[in-house]
Amino acid sequence: MVRHLVVGDLRVQRIERKGGWRSWTIVWPEGALHAEADRFLRVHDGSGTQKTYAYYLVDHLRWLERECLAFGAVQLRDLERYMGIVGADVHMPLGEPWRVGKRPYGRDASATAASCLKGFYLHQASLGVNVGLGEKLDGTRLPSRVDRRRSLLGT
């Protein structure tokens, strides 16, 4: 695994717990806890899912910042576009490239990202944030089928 220091951006932070347990959260560049992400990740405390979700969620949160989108303003179409940008097969304009230099998500990664994002926004809706999106997500699947054309090209 390649490790590099992340400076000036949201990042995943490991937290050492008593008894050798580890938890994972997301922090702002100055080191402050990202409260919304932490509340969601705590639901998965002690599971292997927490670390995986933290890395998928931090990528999405960085994308939200670049797109100047707040949680309360995110629409289903924004999530579909994000999934398309990271490799899912969607039929819409995707906008500027994201994750430049990285391969698109494969089938399993795309499904995990969709599950993470759906869980995150349903959790936000349960707290009263962007309830409309939560209602739409409750009966919808985010696109996770891999765009084979992009997978072959590696873009």
Task: Give the predicted meaning of each segment.
Residues 1-45, 51-58, 62:
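Basic/aromatic DNA-contact patch characteristic of tyrosine site-specific recombinases
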Residues 36-49, 58-153:
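N-terminal core-binding DNA-recognition domain of tyrosine recombinases/integrases
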